[in-house]
């Protein structure tokens, strides 16, 4: 059962409360590389566990959600999405170290391709930013932006000092032209 665009928007808002609504580009959502040594039934079961995990997280049952994400990873350990979802849950629970480990694994397994990679790079960029490591955050946001994540694109601009200076100058110029300066 594929989630609708509205369902994906709601799930994205739940798992990424700091991200702007609707930032997940449609063209990368469905992309998933075939996974070697994993049969389609296992992938289907893993996706079902992930959906159950998201539903439990939405209901505030983080322990139940974690159990579902762990089952998804057990069933399809080479699938990046399970690690990415568990990382998002870990971040919500305040366990940034576990989140970082899962995001690193998601990036490795995704081969830097598709929605899982875009989300993992963006989430890892947020964790780096929380740690005060803006250089690493900028690199991850650039990767996420390249893969189509709109929030990562915005953060790439925000962390670029030249872009920030240009944005400030542009805002001042527009303010002067409109008489608000």
Swiss-Prot record:
Pfam families: TPR_8
TPR repeat spans: 46-79, 81-113, 118-151
Classification via InterPro entries: TPR-like_helical_dom_sf, TPR_rpt, TTC36
Alphabetical keyword list: Repeat, TPR repeat
GO BP, sorted A to Z: tyrosine metabolic process
Family statement: Belongs to the TTC36 family.
Protein's name in the database: Tetratricopeptide repeat protein 36 homolog
Native source species: Nematostella vectensis (Starlet sea anemone)
